[in-house]
Amino acid sequence: VHGSRGLGDVYKRQHLVEMDIQVKQSLEGVGQNLQDHLETYVQYECKKPVTLFNEYNPIKMALTGIEWFLFKTGTAAYSNLETGGFIRSNDLVDYPNIQYHFFPSLVLDHGRTNPDRHAFQAHVGPMRPTSRGEIKLKSTNPTSAPSIRFNYMQTEHDLSEMREGIRLAREIFHQKAFDEYRGKEINPGNVDSDTELNEFIKNKGDTAYHPCGTCKMGKDNTSVVNEKLQVYGVENLRVVDASIMP
């Protein structure tokens, strides 16, 4: 995000003209090719009191914080995404195209809202989405926040992989090992058709906070940096962040 914003003076010519910025050098690829990992959460109530819901009592949270501060141990000392995996969603793909994380609680509103019950979930996300977004300037002030448009799930490829990932997560959670823990499905809930799952994905999908690609490395006319991270056509300027990923 900040990589392309930092190159505000070398956006593609049309955008610079629109923003009334004097054009000294323009690169068509600046701010284009925005990519991110989108996730959906397959969530179930847990029939046993063994989840992180036990940790949300304010007193317990304070004690957990003190334990970590003094001893670097306890619940706050490790990632609560305790396990995960990469899976091929069907026999036609030749690489693990879906990633899973298991979390022994509910994520609500990006973690800003505490859960109200014992539950667990799988984070489901396609690895190589084909949808592309863009970042544009909203102001000539270089410190102003840009306009960010991710364009998630704009291709049937991306929607299809997410649907397959959700159905596989359900299959995993319905294995015998989960029988004593698995309660009612919370999300997606009582939906299964492609149309219903598409609506769930579009309404409930969340970012995995992996934006990249807006100053991509390469040699075509949409590339922004070379293999040394040097910006094409500008001396002594490099981009050194995830935006250079093609």
List each language-model region with its residue ranges.
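FAD-dependent oxidoreductase catalytic-site/capping-region signature
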Residues: K47-V50, T64-P246
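Single conserved hydrophobic/aromatic residue that forms the stacking wall/gate
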Residues: V1-Y11
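Short linear loop/turn motifs
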Residues: E28-N33, C215-K216
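Rossmann-like dinucleotide-binding core of oxidoreductases
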Residues: E18, L34-T64, F69-L70, T75
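Acidic glycine-/aspartate-rich tracts in secreted/extracellular proteins
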Residues: K12, Q22, H174-F178
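Histidine-centered active-site/metal-ligand motif
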Residues: H2, H37, H210
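A short alpha-helix-loop-beta-strand transition element characteristic
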Residues: D20-G29
